[in-house]
Amino acid sequence: MKSDDQWKARAELIQSAPEVGEVTATTLIAEVPELGQLNRQKISALIGVAPFNRDSGQFRGRRTIFGGRRAVRSVLYMAALSARRHNPLIRAFADRLEARGKLQKVVLVACMRKLLVILNTMVKTNTHWNPKSA
């Protein structure tokens, strides 16, 4: 990846986001070639961080996440843990969810999805991290 200028530029773009390191950027580039080409709903479903409902008739089931690309979910989990503490945008988002009574794991998965959507938009628009526009 370091030898190819296109991949190197994409990795630097992804790493411009706070708390997104080399491992996260490399995994996203290698495992998700669709990054920057899909909308936020489709990229979230592809990775497996979009909630799916289990409704039938009048029964309203739980919303769960499943499927997707396990390696990407693993690195997003670690990046979201770090971003939850150090990224002001993700921290404010998580605090809002916790204030509404959401559980810690639910909040963390929502942070994973938020981080993925931000990174997808950054790649799509070819812009570096800007906390005001994120």
Give the residues covered by each predicted segment.
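A detector of single, family-specific signature residues
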Residues: 1-134
